[in-house]
């Protein structure tokens, strides 16, 4: 390969230096006009990894791939009626409050049950609640909360109930073609950048509708147009499967239902993973149940016949007794939970190893305390029993 003439190399270097200077001048001008951080090289970003907040369900965190809901993104949860959509969202609210954050609930359906929310772990005294009169009002309230930067999670329940003002003021039977879709499209354009900037998680619950005249393919669709589908980083399809029967006196009573949550869209991890959870009536997602199942599959909790054991210690005969043990021993629950998350790469293994190291450090201290030599005072009286 022929070398470039020396003169041509000098011209190339000079031209490259001029381009670099022009680029730096443009970057400085952009930052001056729009603020620091408005443009930067990707490698200069302080945080490359997407920050997440746990969904409140171990199985769902694993299915999401990143360990929870990504911060600064839009999440859509949809499914049939009574499938558990609001329950999944309320667990996210409880988790946000548990981590010290502030959560808001835009109840467009006017159907939130405070007692049920409290049973799921939501601090209803600290929960911000709005029951808007129209779709525009609900989205404006959500926008102001997000723009404040003080709210960590905003839940809108539901998109289908965000009725445009023109439809409310009109008569029943009036045609309002595409009105709600235009409202949602405008809201997504307006809220998208603000959500990302403030690192707020915005969860939109949606219902299902069926397209008329569809002979082939899936006739199901979600109301509110296509904007939400495009702007959402994660979309969850929630479906109730089989009913769960009780035990003992309640063996003929339905005490919950097995629910399948499918990640149909995921921009931060591989999509199409599924989580199967048990939603118990009046309690929400059974955290002990999902941990017991996943830990047993990973052989962290051993199962022999009907008995479950952890670290060679039996924790219960039958799944119900094992769940009860985990509920009564939160330190064991947290220890197993960390091991499971470490196995799936949701947390660094250092946390688990540090805990094991601390436990090992404590063991010799206990032995030293037991084997510690006590100096003998010759003035003491000793009683010696001699066996005949």
Curated annotation (Swiss-Prot):
- Main localisation: cytoplasm
Q: Name one GO biological process term.
A: SOS response
What species is this protein from?
Answer: Streptococcus pneumoniae (strain ATCC BAA-255 / R6)
- Specify which residues bind ATP according to the UniProt entry for this protein: 79-86
Chain's role: Can catalyze the hydrolysis of ATP in the presence of single-stranded DNA, the ATP-dependent uptake of single-stranded DNA by duplex DNA, and the ATP-dependent hybridization of homologous single-stranded DNAs. It interacts with LexA causing its activation and leading to its autocatalytic cleavage. Required for DNA transformation; protects transforming DNA from degradation, possibly in combination with DprA. Present at 15,000-30,000 monomers per competent cell.
Q: What is this protein called?
A: Protein RecA
Q: How does it assemble?
A: Interacts with DprA; probably forms mixed DprA-RecA-ssDNA filaments.
Give the Acidic residues compositional bias ranges.
Answer: 370-388
The record's keywords, sorted A to Z, are:
ATP-binding, Competence, Cytoplasm, DNA damage, DNA recombination, DNA repair, DNA-binding, Nucleotide-binding, SOS response
SMART domains reported in the protein's UniProt record:
AAA (SM00382)
- Family note: Belongs to the RecA family.
Q: Where are the stretches annotated Disordered?
A: 347-388
Q: Please name the GO terms that the record assigns under molecular function.
A: ATP binding; ATP hydrolysis activity; ATP-dependent DNA damage sensor activity; damaged DNA binding; single-stranded DNA binding
Q: Where in the cell is it found?
A: Cytoplasm
Per its UniProt entry, which superkingdom is the organism in? Bacteria
Q: What turns on expression?
A: By competence and DNA damage.
Does this entry carry the keyword Calcium? no
Pfam families reported in the protein's UniProt record: RecA, RecA_C
Q: Where is the composition biased (Basic and acidic residues)?
A: 357-369
- What GO cellular-component annotations does this UniProt entry give? cytoplasm
């Amino acid at each position: 390969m022929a070398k470039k003439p020396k003169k041509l190399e000098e011209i190339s270097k000079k031209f490259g230096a001029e381009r670099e200077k022009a680029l730096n001048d443009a970057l400085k001008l952009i930052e001056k006009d729009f603020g620091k951080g408005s443009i930067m090289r990707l490698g200069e970003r302080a945080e490359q990894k997407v920050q997440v907040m746990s969904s409140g369900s171990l199985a769902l965190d694993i299915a999401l791939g990143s360990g929870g809901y990504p911060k600064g993104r839009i999440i859509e949860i949809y499914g049939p009626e009574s499938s558990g959509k609001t329950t999944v969202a309320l667990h996210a609210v409880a988790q946000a409050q548990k981590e010290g954050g502030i959560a808001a609930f835009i109840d467009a359906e006017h159907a939130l049950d405070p007692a049920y929310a409290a049973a799921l772990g939501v601090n209803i005294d600290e929960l911000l609640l709005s029951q808007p009169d129209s779709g525009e009002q609900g989205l404006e309230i959500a926008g102001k909360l997000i723009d404040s930067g003080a709210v960590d999670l905003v839940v809108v329940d539901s998109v289908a109930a965000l009725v445009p003002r023109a439809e409310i003021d009109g008569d029943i039977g009036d045609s309002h073609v595409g009105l709600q879709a235009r409202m949602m499209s405008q809201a997504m354009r307006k809220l998208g950048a603000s959500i990302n900037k403030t690192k707020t998680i915005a969860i939109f619950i949606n219902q299902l509708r069926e397209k008329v005249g569809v002979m082939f393919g899936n006739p199901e669709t979600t109301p509110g147009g296509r904007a939400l589908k495009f702007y959402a980083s994660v979309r969850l399809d929630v479906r109730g499967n089989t009913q769960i029967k009780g035990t003992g006196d309640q063996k003929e009573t339905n005490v919950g239902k097995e629910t399948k949550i499918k990640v149909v869209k995921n921009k931060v991890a591989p999509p199409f993973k599924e989580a199967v959870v048990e939603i118990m009536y009046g309690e929400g997602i059974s955290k002990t149940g999902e941990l017991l199942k996943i830990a047993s599959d990973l052989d962290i909790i051993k199962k022999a016949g009907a008995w479950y054991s952890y670290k060679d210690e039996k924790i219960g005969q039958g799944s119900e007794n094992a769940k009860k043990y985990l509920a009564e021993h939160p330190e064991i629950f947290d220890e197993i939970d960390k091991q499971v998350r470490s196995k799936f790469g949701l947390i660094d293994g250092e946390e688990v190893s540090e805990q094991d190291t601390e436990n090992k450090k404590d063991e010799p201290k206990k032995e030293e305390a037991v084997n510690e030599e006590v100096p003998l005072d010759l003035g003491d009286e000793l009683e010696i029993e001699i066996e005949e």
